Amino acid sequence: MANAVRFNRKSQNEFSKMFHSLCDRHRNWQVWSDFITVAAIEIACSIDRTSDDTKSRMSEYKSIMEKYSPDERAKFADMFALIVDGLEANPEQDFLGEMFMGLGLSNHWKGQVFTPYSVCHMIAAISIDAIADKAEQNGWASAVDPCCGAGALLIALRNEAVQKQIPPTSLLFVGQDIDRVAALMC
């Protein structure tokens, strides 16, 4: 059924094809979980190589990548590049959330139905002035999403903040989720 989904953007279609090509030898959910975990570890290590967590992160990274052939590992890198390309072409989207839902990976038992980006954009547009006021008064402001999914609301808030020219150093975005993979997508 997930193969029948048609995505609107070239990067999403390419991502879907690569994802499904990895699912010949591995279960869909495992490929997604492994890809998201590896991508999150790569981002975390690129930002902070001195953390006490770096060694355990790299150990997890290696144990995941050992399951995949060199060609499959290369597809992980290509999939990450497609996400970057997609977000650079259009930052006003929830690339991973749309992929997650479109590939049929949500878990209705956990209540995983991601809010569409258009709804998140509307909420962000309504909320941004109050956040901007708080940042101006206190020198900083935060936005917390306690069930962040792939982070669509936080992405929309960030995009609204950019449009309002709110200094990024005055904002703290926090995303949490009961599902580790969803939190790593954020």
Give a label for each model feature.
Residues 86, 97, 102-104, 111, ...:
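Residue-identity detector for glycine
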Residues 94-129:
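Class I SAM-dependent transferase core
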Residues 22-29, 109-114, 143, 147, ...:
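Short, charged/polar micro-motifs that form catalytic or ligand-binding hotspots
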Residues 1-101:
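A short N-terminal interaction module
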Residues 48-52, 108, 132-136:
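Short, solvent-exposed secondary-structure capping/transition elements
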